[in-house]
Amino acid sequence: KWLYGVDDCRGAAYRTNLGLKPEDNYINNGVLLIDLEAWRKNKVEDMFLQYIRENQGDITFVDQGVQNGVLSKLGRSGILHPKYNCMTVFFAFDYKNLIKLRKPPVPGDSMQYQEAVKNPAIVHFQSCFRMSIRPWVVGCKHPYAKTYLEYKAKSPWKETPMMPDDRTVPQKMLSVVTSIMPESLMVSSISFVHTKIYPLARNLKQRINK
């Protein structure tokens, strides 16, 4: 393997839109373990550039799409334990609802998921409609926001002021509405958009651009 990362828990369409099979690995690019020697020897950068040209630069999730579209297709990517890239969505949903929400073709191990949330090695503060803002933004409710601020206070950036919440009105409305919806209704509604509507829209856009 030339690249390892944590499974991003995405539906089949996110893979097939990249030319992958539904069961192929699809990893998140937040934390990566790279075999640099193999990377250079096999000219992976050139492969990436060729893939970008072939798709006119229009690739879902940009660099994440490129790395999966190239290396997963070659069978050169592997999966790490989720504790090494414990994403915000892991904290926002329990395992059962995360699988219902994302509908991955090959669900990750539930015990590993629970272990990651309980004892993460690396916390990835990513965007998530349920916890939309990061800990350097005023009002963050992430369970590790306090820990982040404790380490920030010990860093050279301790005097850097907190950023304001600059989400758009629709983004804030989505966060509020989904927080008051019944859990099952919210999960099924967002799942339909996430696994069907968004990938379909991206696929149509890419076809038009080609």
Can you annotate each of these PLM segments?
Residues L20-V31:
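A recurrent flexible, glycine/aromatic-enriched loop bordering the glycosyltransferase active site
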Residues N17-G19, D109:
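Eukaryotic intrinsically disordered and solvent-exposed regulatory patches
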Residues K1-N17:
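Conserved donor-nucleotide/metal-binding helix-loop-beta segment in metal-dependent transferases, i.e.
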Residues N29, I34-K210:
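A glycosyltransferase accessory/donor-loop signature
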